[in-house]
Amino acid sequence: MALLKRFSSLYFAVLFLGLIGFRPASGETLDEIHQKAVKEGGTLNFYGTLAQVNAEKILPVFEKRFPGIKINHVDATSDKLVARAVTEARGGKTLGDVLQIPLENVVQAHDQGLLLDTNLPESSDYPVGLKGSFWVASDLQYFIAAWNTNQVKKEEEPKTYDDFLNPRWKGRLIAEPRDLEMLLAFAKYRFKSDEKAIEFWKKIAAQNVEFHKGHSQLAELLVAGQAAACLTCYSHHYPSRIKKGAPVNYMLSEGVASINGTAIFKGAPHPNTALLFARWIGGLEGQKVMAQGGRNPAHPKVEPVEKTRTAKTYFITASDLKEFPKYDKIWKEIFKLR
């Protein structure tokens, strides 16, 4: 009975927070929120897929900026983090404060009723596709084309994806089999037509594209000269390799961007601390730290440290995610993937 009473109290507390939202007083500064956050125990439970190589450069800056707060980084794949949060919520105790994972999984968490509608003031600096009522973009990953400079002559380097329709590329291309975002983005934003996008990728498929799982593996295959070009690589994989002398180059004229988002858990044990981090990471200050930490900042006014942002970008937005199954099926049919 005591356990049931405890669960009921927690349930209604979470429900209440979800209905009214957790918002600071109007015009409240980060330093004012910091004062409240320290009184909550000095801990931020950060559920995030932020790679350790980036986290060790980014998270300590927050801790130094806001003394008295230490970040407990719960690091796992995005699906495991959502599953963990669901299990905790069903058990009647929310443990996470902030969630920072790919947007697809942020939306899944919201559909499970785990996230708070916040409408952070910092989100006003972002375009519509990079924010929502319960999230704001933290960083981006750009799908671009790259090539081995030993195998591709300077005059043959691609300027746009259309250049890959040239017969010279047949049997020389690699890609990631799960990157249905390329088809979706081309259909929605490049061609604004399913028919034209499908026709384009069917022509690409006729070039006998070879598929390999893992974007890091694609980059290594390209560096090793086992393929001439990659169609669905991550732009941030190449600057460091080029600095080390790898014979590769990449195209930034156009590309597809997937979004990582930041959100606050309903019933977060440290609500002011969660709010502080979400506002900091979404603002200019935090976004500059993200860039210095090796990520592609989402803020329109903050440039990445390396040249990794595409000139023309087709963003995968929250509204697109519900159509993933549709385009995944078509993508697999086009390339005869299982």
Positions of predicted regions on the chain:
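Extracytoplasmic ligand-binding site segments that recognize negatively charged/polar headgroups
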Residues: 31, 45-60, 72-89, 93-226
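Periplasmic-binding protein-like
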Residues: 127-128, 140-144, 171-178, 201-205, 211-212, 281-303, ...
